[in-house]
A protein has these predicted regions:
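Transmembrane helix-loop-helix hairpins at lipid-water interfaces of multipass membrane proteins
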Residues: 21-89, 172-180, 184, 289-293
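Transmembrane helices of ABC transporter permease
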Residues: 23-29, 156-207, 277-292
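Hydrophobic alpha-helical segments in the permease module
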Residues: 83-90, 187-188, 264-267, 271, ...
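Loop segments that connect adjacent transmembrane helices in multi-pass transporters
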Residues: 129-134, 207-255, 322, 327-331, ...
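Cytosolic ends of transmembrane helices, especially the final helix of ABC transmembrane type-1 domains
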Residues: 230, 234, 258-261, 305-335
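Helix-to-loop junction immediately C-terminal to a conserved catalytic motif
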Residues: 409
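ABC ATPase nucleotide-binding domain helical subdomain, centered on the C-loop/LSGGQ "ABC signature"
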Residues: 420, 436, 454-497, 541-542, ...
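Conserved signature/switch motifs of ABC ATPase nucleotide-binding domains
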Residues: 518, 549
Length: 584
């Protein structure tokens, strides 16, 4: 618990912490009002049963004299009306306090989820080479939701603890012995419950986290591979694997729900047994009945508030243990940010200028090996690309063709060497975004939004900022404009998830149009046509070759016909990039 509070103090910003302090103050006021309501209820019950009891209560007698009423009966009626008003005010205040608490929790829950998404997006490309997509999805959604469930449990725990403390203090004034006895029994029982159930709840929370990720993973894999799943007739296998994870997830949730009910049953049993045992003791020792009625009337009224509070306190302690793994996951993911490391959390904007390149792009002295591997993909390699030239890069599978592109794009960080645009280091502060602004990238598998053709070409551009004329210009360059004009909905045609309603060639042409939309000087094709048939590839390359001389073209290819019109061809092998054809 202490560790959670320490991390929470660092995780929340100043505004959030100030809001929490305000909520705690409201909780204390609410606790006082609840205790006052219990106290008034006991006093009113005594006055209604015996109006003469006013004389035995200094507070009641003082109120009676101030009001100046004619009889105790009239006074009791007025007091009952006041009791109703007190409970109305108390409950209205509690409603407002709960509303503010829930508003704080759920508003900041989404903000933290957005913060997590930003945190993941600013991570380097190398992180995603080994990342589990299901874990990333869970971290941004489920982990954050459960983290705020923990914060809500902590706030409610504090609120109920303050109420319990106030009510116990009131009971102590009425019957010190009984209150101490009850408090000792409850504290021992709560300590025992916490000691036994906390490890069980923590394990259930960890299992929930792991199995929830697996459920995400199997759903994602099933949908992404639906064609192969159906052709191979393996539907049952995927359902079975999903069921296995589901069984573990259900078991974890069941354990949490079941063991969360145990404290309530134990506490109610212990409280009733303690009170009845104390009554037996009083009867056996000959305590007058009227004294017993006063004491137990007070305790019974207090129990209406205290028992639910104590039950909730135990549930909240168990919930804290259950949600702790989720909270720690969020905290760990935001650790760099929390530690105040120099991290740029902002993103590229339309205002960013392009890094102009007039003469050449160079990779100098590049050494690179993928994480957790020893084999060097590049060993002090050099590569030069003249501006305006069409440059092909070939090599065997695994030689490092696509790695060249990833290093040029700044996605991979070499252990030695630099990337220069006209002698300007593109990774120097302030240069990298400008460098990317001047590059159009066409991969083998075009990433498609489940949206319209318009949104896929003007990728990531807000609707109100899309340049309609530019859209049609690049579609014409990609030789896709005539096809779109034949569609009933034109640019507003939905392409389906992963562009399933389009052919492979049409998807690639959308990729070309997208790469050209921002009018970059450099166009990179990373095996962009290798998955297409020969005729479609020839048509796509015709569109690309029309840009020869107007753009600097960097073409990664398997097939020689793809690069037959390139001015320079590099072959990547043995950790180097060697010119196979053409001259610099």
């Amino acid at each position: 618990m202490i560790q959670i509070i320490k991390k929470l103090r660092v995780l929340l910003d100043k505004k959030q912490k100030r809001t929490m302090v305000g909520l705690i103050i409201l909780m204390v006021i609410s606790a006082f009002l609840q205790t006052a309501g219990v106290g008034m209820l006991v006093e009113v019950m005594q006055i209604v049963i015996d109006p003469e009891a006013v004389q035995h209560s200094r507070v009641a007698e003082a109120c009676y004299e101030i009001m100046g009423v004619e009889s105790y009966r009239t006074f009791s009626i007025i007091v009952m009306v006041l009791l109703i008003l007190v409970f109305v005010v108390k409950n209205l205040f509690t409603y407002v306090q709960q509303k503010l608490t829930l508003s704080f929790v759920y508003t900041n829950q989404f903000r933290t989820s957005e913060r997590m998404m930003r945190n993941y997006l600013r991570r380097g490309y190398e992180f995603y080479l080994n990342a589990d997509t299901a874990v990333v999805q869970r971290s941004i959604t489920s982990d954050v939701n459960n983290m705020y469930a923990l914060i809500l449990a902590l706030l409610q725990l504090l609120s109920d603890s303050v109420v319990s403390l106030f009510v116990i203090s009131y009971c102590f004034i009425s019957s010190g012995t009984m209150t101490i006895l009850m408090a000792v029994v409850l504290l021992l029982l709560m300590w025992l419950i916490k000691r036994v159930l906390k490890p069980i709840m923590y394990k259930a929370g960890k299992d929930n986290q792991d199995y929830y990720s697996s459920l995400f993973k199997w759903i994602s894999q099933t949908v992404q591979g639906i064609k192969e799943v159906k052709i191979s007739g393996k539907e049952q296998y995927f359902v079975s694997e999903y069921r296995k994870c589901g069984k573990g997830y259900v078991d974890a949730v069941q354990r949490y729900s079941l063991y969360n009910q145990v404290p309530k049953l134990l506490i109610e049993t212990a409280c009733v047994a303690t009170m009845v045992g104390y009554m037996i003791f009083l009867v056996a020792t000959g305590v007058p009945t009227e004294n017993m009625l006063t004491v137990f009337g007070t305790l019974a009224a207090a129990a209406l508030v205290l028992l639910p509070c104590v039950n909730r306190i135990n549930n909240q302690i168990n919930s804290t243990a259950y949600f702790e793994p989720f909270f720690m996951g969020v905290s760990d993911n935001l650790q760099d940010e929390i530690n105040g490391q120099n991290i740029d959390m902002s993103f590229a904007t339309d205002e960013d200028e392009k890094l102009d390149v007039k003469e050449s792009i160079e990779m100098k002295d590049i050494t690179y090996a993928y994480p957790n591997t020893e084999r060097l993909i590049f060993d002090h390699a050099d590569l030069k690309i003249p501006v305006g030239a069409s440059v092909g890069i070939v090599g065997t599978s695994g030689a490092g063709k696509s790695t060249v592109v990833d290093i040029l794009l700044g996605l991979l960080e070499p252990s030695t060497g630099h990337i220069y645009a006209d002698s300007v280091d593109v990774k120097e502060p302030g240069n990298y975004r400008k460098w990317l602004k001047n590059i159009g990238y066409i991969p083998q598998m075009i990433f498609m939004l489940d949206d319209t053709i318009r949104k896929n070409v003007a990728f990531g551009v807000p609707e109100d900022k899309i340049d309609e004329d530019r859209l049609w210009e690049v579609l014409k360059e990609a030789q896709l404009d005539e096809f779109i004009k034949t569609l009933p909905e034109g640019l507003e045609t939905g392409i389906g998830e992963r562009g399933i309603r389009l052919s492979g060639g049409q998807r690639q042409r959308i990729g070309i149009a997208r790469a050209l939309y921002n009018d970059p000087e450099v166009l990179i094709l990373d095996e962009a046509t290798s998955a297409l048939d020969n005729d479609t590839e020839a048509a796509i390359m015709e569109s690309i070759n029309r840009l020869h001389g107007r753009k600097t073209l960097i073409i990664i290819a398997h097939r020689l016909q793809t690069i037959e019109k390139c001015d320079i061809v590099y072959r990547v092998e043995d950790g180097r990039a060697k010119i196979e054809r053409g001259n610099l």
